[in-house]
C-alpha cells in the first residue's frame, strides 16, 4: 500500500479536519506498536514523529531480539519469562525479521566473572525451560574449553574454562519499526514523520484536547485535535510531558548511552554471536556479532545528559570497547582506524528502580543451595504447583546478595511504565524492543477503557499476538520455504540469486511488490537493479524522504556496507532528486546531510 510523501501530506491535511480518537507522539518502536494496534482495532488514529521513524533510539540497539539470559544474573525470573514469551510472539507476527542465532558464551576464571560453568549451566537450563526449548535441538549446550576454541579459535585462551551455547535471535530494529508503521498506515492511521509537537490544546477544565504541531519540512504550524494523546517519545518523554505541565516538572527518565562499533570481518572473524564479560571487573558483558561480512561489538552503558537528538561516540567509548575486544581476541589488534561504522543510541530508562538488569552483572555471592531452591520453585511455578508469590518470595530471599547497592547505569530498570497525568496526557515509557507489543497492548487496554468511560466510544481490541506486521504475512512454520519462493520470483525479474535472497529476507511478504517494480522501472544510473527497486519501494511505500532515511534505516547500508557505500551515495541522491523533483539547492542540502551522517558514522572527528 502506498505510504509516501503524498500520503504524508494527505495525512497532515486529514489530521486537521477531524477529532482523532488517539494521537500518538513518537514514531519509534513503542509508538509504532501502539499505532498498529489502535488502527487495527478501529480507532481513528494519528501518529507524528519529529524525525524519521526509529531515528531517535529504535534504530540504535544491539540489533537482537533478546531472550534475556543476562537477566538471570540478577534472577529476574519474571522478566525472562515475559521476555522469551514476547520474543516468540514477535517471531509469529514478524517472521521475516527475527532470525535464530545461537549465542556463544565463553566463561573465564577471573575476578568478578558473571558465571561459573556450573552457574551458567543452571541459568541456561532455566532459560530454556522458560523459553520452551528444553529437550529440543535449540536447547543449550555446555562446552569444554576445547569445544569453545573449536568454535572460536581466536578467543583468548588464558583463563578460559569452557562456555555454553544458547538460543538468541538477531533483529533488524529499524525494519521492525517501519513494518509496524506500514501496517498501521494500511489499517487507516494518519501518519507523518518530521512533524513536531510544540504544545498542547486544552479545554476549559485544563484537559488536553490535542496538540500544536509544526511540519518541519514546510514550517507550517497547525492543530491536531484528539480525544486522547499518548506520549511514546522514549528519551524525550519528560520533555513532552513538561510541555503540558504548568506545575512541577517531570524527571522520570534516566537515559543511558550505548555505543557499537563495526569492523571488517577480517579483523575479527566470529562464526556466531559471542557474549562475554568485559574482564574489567565492572560486572558488564559485551557482544561481538557477525553481520553482512562485518563484525560489530558493544555496548557501553553510561549515564547521558547531552543532546538527545545527536548522541556521539567519544574517545572514551572507543577506548573502552577496543580494550575489551582486543583483550578477548588477542590477535585482532584493532585500532580506531579499523572502525568502518559506528552508532550511539540512548536507552529510555526509568530511574529509581533496579529490578531489571540490561547489561550489568551482580557481584553477590550466592550459595548453590539458594540457587537450586530458586530453580525448583520456578519449575513448580511453571507446572502450576507454585504461585507467582512463591517465585517472588524465592527471588526476594536472594536480593541481599544479588541486588546492586547503588543504581549504576547498567542496573536502571528496563521495565516500562504507563502514566496518566491530571491533564489527561498518557505517557508510555521505558521497556525493551522485545517487549514493544506487550507494552502497546497494555496501553491500548487503558486507552479503550478511557474512551468508553469518558467519551462513550466503544472498541474491541484485536488479538495483537497473531496480527502480523507489514511483510509478516508468512506461515511462521514455513518461513524459509516461502522466502525461497519469493527469492526465485526476484530471480525471474532479473536479479541475481544473492540480491533476490537479500531482498526477500528484508521485505518478507512484501517482496513480490518490490520485485513487481521491475516491470515499470529502469535500473537507475550507478545503482544495481536491487538498489533501484529497494530505493523506489522505500520512497513509494516506506516514506523515505532523504538519502539518510534510505541508507541508514530502510536499509543498513551505512552500517554494514560502508566499504561500497561511497559509490552509491551520488546515484541515490540523483535518483531521489529526480523522483522528488528536487532543486539543485535542495539536493545540495541532502548531500550535506549525508556528509554529516557519514562523518558521525565514520568517527571522522576522532580519527583526525
Give a label for each model feature.
Residues 39-59:
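Glycine-rich FAD pyrophosphate-binding loop
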Residues 10, 14, 51, 93, ...:
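C-terminal accessory subdomains/tails of enzymes that are appended
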Residues 193-209:
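A conserved short coil-to-beta-strand element within the FAD-binding core of flavoproteins
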Residues 18-20, 217-228:
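Core beta-strand elements of the Rossmann-like FAD/NAD(P) dinucleotide-binding domain
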Residues 26-28, 50:
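Glycine-rich Rossmann-fold phosphate-binding loop(s) that bind the pyrophosphate
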Residues 63-147, 151, 286:
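Dinucleotide-binding Rossmann-like beta1-alpha1 core, especially the glycine-rich loop
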Residues 1-22, 37-41:
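Extreme N-terminal leader/targeting segments of oxidoreductases
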Residues 24-25, 224-234:
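Short hydrophobic core segments
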Amino acid at each position: 500500500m502506498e505510504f509516501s510523501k503524498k500520503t504524508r501530506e494527505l495525512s497532515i491535511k486529514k489530521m486537521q479536519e477531524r477529532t482523532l480518537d488517539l494521537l500518538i507522539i513518537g514514531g519509534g518502536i513503542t509508538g509504532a506498536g501502539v499505532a498498529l494496534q489502535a488502527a487495527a482495532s478501529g480507532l481513528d488514529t494519528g501518529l507524528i514523529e519529529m524525525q524519521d521513524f526509529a531515528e531517535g533510539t529504535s534504530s540504535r540497539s544491539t540489533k537482537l531480539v533478546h531472550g534475556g539470559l543476562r537477566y538471570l544474573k540478577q534472577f529476574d525470573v519474571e522478566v525472562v519469562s515475559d521476555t522469551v514469551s514476547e520474543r516468540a510472539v514477535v517471531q509469529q507476527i514478524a517472521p521475516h525479521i527475527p532470525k535464530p542465532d545461537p549465542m556463544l558464551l565463553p566463561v573465564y576464571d577471573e575476578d568478578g566473572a558473571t558465571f561459573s560453568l556450573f552457574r551458567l549451566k543452571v541459568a541456561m537450563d532455566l532459560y530454556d525451560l522458560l523459553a520452551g526449548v528444553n529437550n529440543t535441538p535449540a536447547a543449550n549446550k555446555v562446552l569444554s574449553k576445547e569445544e569453545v576454541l573449536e568454535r572460536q579459535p581466536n578467543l583468548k585462551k588464558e583463563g578460559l574454562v569452557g562456555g555454553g551455547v544458547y538460543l538468541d535471535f538477531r533483529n533488524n530494529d529499524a525494519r521492525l519499526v517501519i513494518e509496524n508503521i506500514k501496517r498501521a498506515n494500511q489499517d487507516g492511521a494518519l501518519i507523518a514523520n518530521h512533524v513536531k509537537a510544540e504544545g498542547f490544546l486544552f479545554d476549559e477544565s485544563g484537559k488536553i484536547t490535542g496538540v500544536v504541531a509544526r511540519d518541519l519540512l514546510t514550517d507550517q504550524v497547525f492543530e491536531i485535535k484528539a480525544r486522547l494523546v499518548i506520549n511514546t517519545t522514549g528519551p524525550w518523554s519528560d520533555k513532552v510531558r513538561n510541555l503540558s505541565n504548568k506545575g512541577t516538572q517531570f524527571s522520570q527518565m534516566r537515559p543511558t548511552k550505548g555505543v557499537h562499533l563495526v569492523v571488517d570481518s577480517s579483523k575479527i572473524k566470529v562464526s556466531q554471536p559471542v557474549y562475554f564479560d568485559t574482564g574489567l571487573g565492572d560486572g558488564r558483558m559485551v557482544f561481538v556479532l557477525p553481520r553482512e561480512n562485518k563484525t560489530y561489538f558493544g555496548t557501553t552503558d553510561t549515564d547521558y545528559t547531552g543532546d538527545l537528538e545527536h548522541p556521539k561516540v567519544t574517545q572514551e567509548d572507543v577506548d573502552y570497547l577496543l580494550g575489551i575486544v582486543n583483550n578477548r581476541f588477542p590477535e585482532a589488534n584493532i585500532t580506531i582506524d579499523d572502525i568502518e561504522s559506528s552508532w550511539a543510541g540512548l536507552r529510555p530508562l526509568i530511574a529509581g528502580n533496579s529490578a531489571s538488569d540490561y547489561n550489568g552483572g551482580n557481584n553477590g555471592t550466592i550459595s548453590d543451595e539458594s540457587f537450586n531452591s530458586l530453580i525448583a520453585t520456578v519449575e513448580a511455578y511453571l507446572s502450576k504447583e507454585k504461585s507467582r508469590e512463591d517465585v517472588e518470595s524465592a527471588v526476594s530471599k536472594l536480593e541481599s546478595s544479588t541486588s546492586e547497592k547503588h543504581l549504576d547505569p547498567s542496573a536502571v530498570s528496563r521495565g516500562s511504565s504507563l502514566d496518566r497525568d491530571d491533564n489527561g496526557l498518557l505517557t508510555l515509557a521505558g521497556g525493551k524492543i522485545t517487549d514493544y507489543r506487550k507494552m502497546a497492548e497494555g496501553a491500548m487496554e487503558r486507552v479503550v477503557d478511557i474512551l468508553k468511560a469518558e467519551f462513550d466510544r466503544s472498541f474491541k481490541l484485536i488479538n495483537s499476538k497473531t496480527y502480523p506486521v507489514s511483510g509478516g504475512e508468512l506461515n511462521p512454520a514455513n518461513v524459509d520455504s516461502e522466502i525461497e519462493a519469493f527469492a526465485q520470483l526476484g530471480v525471474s525479474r532479473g536479479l541475481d540469486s544473492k540480491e533476490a535472497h537479500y531482498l526477500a529476507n528484508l521485505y518478507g511478504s512484501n517482496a513480490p511488490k518490490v520485485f513487481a517494480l521491475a516491470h515499470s522501472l529502469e535500473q537507475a544510473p550507478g545503482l544495481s537493479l536491487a538498489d533501484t527497486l529497494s530505493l523506489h519501494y522505500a520512497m513509494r511505500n516506506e516514506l523515505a524522504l532523504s538519502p539518510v532515511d534510505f541508507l541508514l534505516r530502510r536499509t543498513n547500508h551505512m552500517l554494514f556496507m560502508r566499504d561500497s557505500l561511497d559509490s552509491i551515495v551520488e546515484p541515490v541522491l540523483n535518483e531521489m532528486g529526480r523522483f522528488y523533483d528536487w532543486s539543485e539547492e535542495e539536493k545540495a542540502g541532502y548531500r550535506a546531510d549525508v556528509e554529516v551522517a557519514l562523518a558521525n558514522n565514520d568517527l571522522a572527528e576522532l580519527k583526525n
